[in-house]
Design a protein with these regions (language model features):
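Conserved subregion of the PPM/PP2C metallophosphatase catalytic domain
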Residues: 1-166
Length: 166
């Protein structure tokens, strides 16, 4: 229903059910199919953002400070989990000139660099804190990750989403 679209944890629960039905997880008791996700719902009238994450965190940059809002430690899909999901929601007052980022663990877990270690969250947050424009931030993270990865194989999906509110 439309009411549910303003509640990100409900959207994630609906997505979880859709994944289970589409992949027939209950029917085959398959446990290795699923995904991590995050959902933002924004009210311009109230300058309020609601966020719910399934193993995905939200990062908000305002005035060169990056703040982390943690998602819950549960993924969507996968048959071995509670039903319905017990997901929390963050209610965040926002101000103009804020930028928002969500990224997958495929980025942070990518092996590379001179020591062949994981890329890490710290590198991403450093780039986010240095840039003022979302487009430039995403471009810089993409280029830095590509350079860091070198000849190492990609381990997972690489998902990076950013937006701003002016």
């Amino acid at each position: 229903s439309l009411e549910d679209l303003s509640q990100p944890e409900r959207i994630l629960n609906q997505l979880d059910e859709l994944l289970e039905d589409t992949l027939k997880l209950k029917e085959y008791d398959v446990t290795n199919f699923g995904m991590d996700a995050g959902v933002c719902c924004f009210s311009r009238k109230k300058n309020l953002l609601l966020y719910s994450g399934a193993k995905m965190n939200l990062y908000i940059k305002h005035d060169n400070i990056v703040q982390e809002y943690k998602g819950d430690k549960i993924s969507l899909g996968y048959s071995q989990k509670p039903h319905p999901l017990q997901l929390s929601s963050h209610q965040i007052n926002i101000s103009n000139n804020s930028s928002f980022y969500i990224f997958s663990d495929g980025i942070t877990d990518q092996i590379g660099g001179p020591k062949n270690i994981m890329y890490g969250k710290k590198r991403i947050l450093n780039i986010i804190s240095k840039n003022s424009k979302v487009e430039k931030t995403i471009f810089d993270i993409s280029k830095d990750l590509e350079s860091y990865q070198q000849n190492n194989k990609r381990r997972d999906d690489l998902s990076l989403f950013g937006f701003s509110i002016a």
